[in-house]
Amino acid sequence: MDYIMTCTSAELALLVTLSGYPGVAKGIAEASVGEKSQKEWEAIMEVTTHQLILKQLWDDDQESKGEIPLKVEIQQFIQGYVKSKWMIRCSNKGQSNILMVHHIENDTWMTHIIDRDIIHEFAYIKGTDIPSIIRNYYSFSEKGIDRAQHFHLSDQAFDLLSERHNIRKVRKISSFTPEEEQSFRAFLNDLELQGWSLYNISLFHNPSIERDPILENIVFFLPAAKGIWVVEYTDHPTAPVRVELNTFEQWCDLLSGVGLEASSVNS
């Protein structure tokens, strides 16, 4: 891992603006501080300029020549960040931060941790580092599971699980075996502990900064005290959603698969 920098949303927005991408910068700033008037925005940017100077990111020589007043390596970093065409996004419901991994070029990727929509930390990594980066980010328990557990749901039942009050309806439209009912109860207990929300790892393709990113793949999962529940889509005709309690080893295999899929975009 090759650390790049840590900055605030305002600092990142100014760096992106100076690099010629005001539209992208606007989105970064508004995600942190909300919509502002032009006068308020100018005041924020003036203060932020002083912060960039203090951090020695500002290049007076470049400014005196009428060029972008940023060090060359910072300009290269911003260009890679804004123009990245592939991104892995790792949600973390239990924390106030999120991990994103942007593809830069060839086997070079960049981790991007956003803390409370305010602090941004960046580092360059290799594609082969992606599985371990994600594994360490989540740091799920390595305790072994007591027994195999799984159940199947229809697409409708899976969608209904986003709301606690739909449990009875999910049971009504599902045909659980006694073993699946027991697994479903265990899953619901873990879902309750996680605020009734699943985690996910998503792969996005962003062919143009003028367009919204395209979701290419997504995996849903949920940590348990022992093991990790993983959602998998199958070719079952009526209940294609399979929810299975994975061992930590299976979780690591899944992340290796994420790494392999990421490596395929290098070519």
Q: What does each of the following model-derived ranges do?
A:
Residues 2-5, 28-30, 64-267:
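Non-catalytic recognition/regulatory regions in large multidomain proteins
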Residues 19, 55-56, 81, 258:
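Generic structural signal for hydrophobic core residues of well-folded globular domains
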Residues 1-53, 59-73:
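Short, amphipathic alpha-helical interface elements at domain boundaries
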